[in-house]
């Protein structure tokens, strides 16, 4: 399969730079997986699309202010993007500098360069950095870090992004990108869903900066997926199995929830799904056999990204590309702060030929 098969024309004007004033007021494009039929509406229509007893699975990761500015003690400017927090003192990070720092290099971080850190080791493209400070890594980031807005949101981060680029149910700090499908849920909508009898469960996948890395190969099968840490606890497993047993649907909110659930299913030895606490490199593209997820809430993704490949594997390649074409024609807002889709599973997707 060629990466270019997943390309589409997107006018720059359709990239959302700010969210809607009200989280749940965005538009919703519904795609019926089996038929490819499209329905246009608003996000709160989700209430009518879900049945009592259906299970919504959210990702409760919380975005950390992961972008730091500063300089090497030797002089050159640097930009640090945290990939993950290793412990209370150390991070693994991408570092942009005219010349990469060497192990032992001293870094002065923060807009006022008040935080002292040392680059201790290099692991491929990533740098291990240790803070020489009494405070925890999280406290330091909250104090001097900037929200790591995606590269296509072409503006500096603002104070408001600390809440706007965060789901209302976020709980566990560690992501450098928001699980954006969840941004559309506000408390009133969650309350109405609960009142209808829709069940809810929470996985954790700390989204890494790798989610924005372009696919740099021509053939999809050659792509090496970045690694992210995911947790699917026992209560989620129990909820999924109970939902399936009563004939209801498991609905993933966001591709990160999909990847968490399907990783746990892949690793399971004795049941459909078992608890999972590990790094995952799961790469979902057409031909993938979904085991757990029956429906998906997701935003509109970048051309040629691994995420549009995941959606194509779920809904079918042709149905997905047709939906994106319609979304562009109807001027839906794209990417992290944009509009959403509700997609039901297409069991025929696994047999579809792509790009022919």
UniProtKB/Swiss-Prot annotation:
Keywords: Cytoplasm, Queuosine biosynthesis, S-adenosyl-L-methionine, Transferase. It catalyses: 7-aminomethyl-7-carbaguanosine(34) in tRNA + S-adenosyl-L-methionine = epoxyqueuosine(34) in tRNA + adenine + L-methionine + 2 H(+). It is found in: Cytoplasm. One of its GO terms (molecular function) is S-adenosylmethionine:tRNA ribosyltransferase-isomerase activity. Gene3D superfamilies: QueA-like (3.40.1780.10). One of its GO terms (biological process) is tRNA wobble guanine modification. Its EC number is 2.4.99.17. It is an enzyme of class 2 (transferase). GO terms for cellular component: cytoplasm. InterPro entries: QueA, QueA_dom1, QueA_dom2, QueA_sf. Its main location: cytoplasm. Pathway: tRNA modification; tRNA-queuosine biosynthesis. NCBIfam families: PRK00147.1, queA. Belongs to the QueA family. Monomer. Transfers and isomerizes the ribose moiety from AdoMet to the 7-aminomethyl group of 7-deazaguanine (preQ1-tRNA) to give epoxyqueuosine (oQ-tRNA). This is S-adenosylmethionine:tRNA ribosyltransferase-isomerase. It comes from Escherichia fergusonii (strain ATCC 35469 / DSM 13698 / CCUG 18766 / IAM 14443 / JCM 21226 / LMG 7866 / NBRC 102419 / NCTC 12128 / CDC 0568-73). The lineage of its organism: Bacteria, Pseudomonadati, Pseudomonadota, Gammaproteobacteria, Enterobacterales.
């Amino acid at each position: 399969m060629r990466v270019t098969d997943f390309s589409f024309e997107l006018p720059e004007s359709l990239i959302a730079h700010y969210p809607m004033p009200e989280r749940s007021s965005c538009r919703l494009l519904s795609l019926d997986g089996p038929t490819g039929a499209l329905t246009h509406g608003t996000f709160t229509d989700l209430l009518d699309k879900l049945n009592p007893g259906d299970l919504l699975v959210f990702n409760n990761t919380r975005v950390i202010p992961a972008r730091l500015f500063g300089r090497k003690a030797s002089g050159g400017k640097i930009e640090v993007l945290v990939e993950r927090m290793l412990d209370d003192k150390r991070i693994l990070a991408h570092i942009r500098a005219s010349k990469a720092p060497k192990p032992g290099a001293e870094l002065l971080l923060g807009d006022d360069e008040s935080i002292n850190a040392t680059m201790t080791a290099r692991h491929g493209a990533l740098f291990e950095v240790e803070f020489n400070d009494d405070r925890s890594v999280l406290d330091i980031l909250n104090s001097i870090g900037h929200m790591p807005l995606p590269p296509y949101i072409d503006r500096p981060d603002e104070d408001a992004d600390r809440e706007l680029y965060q789901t209302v149910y976020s709980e566990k700090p560690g992501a450098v990108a928001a699980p954006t499908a969840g941004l559309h849920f506000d408390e009133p909508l969650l309350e109405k869903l609960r009142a209808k009898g829709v069940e809810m469960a929470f996985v954790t996948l700390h989204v890494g900066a790798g989610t924005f890395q372009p696919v740099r190969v021509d053939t999809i099968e050659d792509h090496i997926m970045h690694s992210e840490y995911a947790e699917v606890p026992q209560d989620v497993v129990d909820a999924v199995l109970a939902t399936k047993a009563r004939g209801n649907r498991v609905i993933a909110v966001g591709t990160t929830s999909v990847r968490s659930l399907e990783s746990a299913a892949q690793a399971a030895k004795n049941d459909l799904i078992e608890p999972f606490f590990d790094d995952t490199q799961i790469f979902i593209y057409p031909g993938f056999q979904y085991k757990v997820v029956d429906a998906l809430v997701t935003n509109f993704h970048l051309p040629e990204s691994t995420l549009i490949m995941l959606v194509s594997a779920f809904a079918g390649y042709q149905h997905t590309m047709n939906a994106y074409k319609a979304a562009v024609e109807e001027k839906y807002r794209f990417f992290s702060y944009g509009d959403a889709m509700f997609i039901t599973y297409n069991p025929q997707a696994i047999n579809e030929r792509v790009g022919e």
